[in-house]
Amino acid sequence: RLNKQFDIIESSGVLHHMENPMAGWKVLTTCLKPGGLMKISLYSELARQHIVKIREEIKELGIGLNDHEIKNLRDIIIRSDKDHHNLIIKSNDFYSLSTLRDLLFHVQEHRFNIPLIKDHLDRLGLKFCGFESKKIVSQFKKTNTQREDLYDLDKWHEYEKENPNVFAEM
């Protein structure tokens, strides 16, 4: 535990791999100065359904963690015409063994939906300040035209349900 507080805290690629993400998030909150900014990256439940399907296939096929098996899996996916395979090919993580291993074989992964994030923010006493991606925000604003819509997690949840891959990149 740090005995220091910060104006800005960024956490990417960590909380969703912890045994208890909420406990980790709570610790980060204690390190945030009042009025500070916390930027958190989490995996989207909806946007990672293609990865869930591929993990099920990996389990069914008994594919292991060695480089040869992972390369063979990658070849199978590249040659496939399945929609969930075509989605993963778009990920930069698909093209490096270490990042593909992390993407498909990580032993622990928690995925989040927006209502759960909203609940966590409320429980932690944090305020949602918006999403960072200009591209995503720009698309959202086409159907959510009021300024306050940008900070309305219920509207974001509806938007994500209509666009399930919007948060595919953490």
What are these regions (language model features)?
Residues 22-37:
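A short glycine-rich, Lys/Arg-flanked "PGG" loop and its adjoining helix->strand segment in the class I
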